[in-house]
Amino acid sequence: MKKYLLWMFAAILTSGLIVTTLTACVNDDNPSVDPVVEDVDLKDPLTIEAVEDGEIDITMEVVLPEPVYYSVNGGEKQEVSLYDPHDPQAHPYTKIDVKVGDKVQLFSRNTTLSKDRDNNNGFYISFESECYVYGNVMSLISPDDNWKDNREIKEPYALEMLFYYTNIVTHPTRHLRLPATKLSKGCYVGMFNSSAITDAPELPATQLAELCYARMFTDCPNLKKTPELPATRLAPRCYYYMFWACRGLTEATELPATKLEEECYAYMFCWCEALTKAPKLPATTLAKDCYAYMFGSCVSLPDAPELPATQLAEDCYSYMFARCKKITEAPELPATTMVKGCYSGMFSETGLTKAPELPSTQLAESCYEAMFSYCDDLTEATALPATQLEKRCYSYMFTHCGNLTSAIELPAEELPERCYNSMFFKCFKLSSVKCLATTMTGNYPLMSWLKYAGTDESVSTRTLTHAPETPWVNSDEDSTGLTDWFVPTGWTLVSL
């Protein structure tokens, strides 16, 4: 049978995608159809489309190696002017008047739009009237005009603050593409900071760079959910403040990384007041400040995620859930060896009613400092079995826990610097403490430790049980010296 070769092309534009159908008829009886899907948003340059009459302003405060161009409705390319603050006649930005439906496209052969961070000078696009933003952002930072295929951002802070304070609205079918899979330090820092964006663009990179997404969506009140974040290889501060104060955010994506980096998630969802579910946190290798303030002030978050790590890092959980008022139960904390500041402020101002078990006998400086401070609903403390203390280890641990009533036992004999400093300050309902200390080895270990404790009208007696021959006395003065064994007036001293 005679063979025929027939090539037929058809292009269908649907939801921002071009579907090209290639039909190859090998013979009359066996045709084959192989659809090839292309993303029109990758093939189009960065485009700003006016939803209403207004103006688009482009501010270029930095001298770049190559000019930045724009075109309106596919017309002739025009150069964005450089703002010279020393020229009294210079206009601070390039003003583009637009009507509904006008499209402004942008191009540049530079590798970065940020060359003068030391003087806070950069490149910004702004518009107060509503505009769609779609197309490929790489049209702004591709030196070989290869932006359609470019997947690498080469220089630091390349697109920093690009759409700061803009009135972005979501196009019904088109999308903004950030296709880079190889990122640079701070490449997207503050990119949409304080903008009206409602749908975040896809972020396909699986290997991150330092500060790459830092403050990217900070204070974006209309953002409801995060984009997928598939990265498994993180970098220091990669998600730092990424969604800070996104007060409409209700959904957070999975965070699959098991090895963390310094401050990688620090402040990531802080002040996301509508967030109701935390992502799973499977990491077992932690880093300094990795979760610091991650969910701070997430006042609608009812449950803390599981925390499986058994080896901690300095300040790793510092203030992680601070001011999460709806969290009433702490996750299990399986680590037995503490690190400096590891749990400091972790549950401060939460709704906990009972402290989790803290089995460690190997403490570290500030390891439990302010851990449960201002937990007004906390009524039950936990056993503190450590007999060897460290500087500030329990400092402010239960301060302002006004409903704490359970008896406290403190078995350590030596008290280092500030170890019990303000530990039970304003625990108004606390009535019983057992302290076996016999020696102070550092300054201020008992500073304000029981100040105002047990002063609620419901408390009839207050008792401090102590080691024999320790010279405790009742005094309302601050304990500052190594011999100031002070307990407030009204407490009964009972020697073992």
Enumerate the predicted regions with their spans.
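Solvent-exposed loop and capping/linker segments of extracellular ligand-binding repeat ectodomains
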Residues: V26-L496
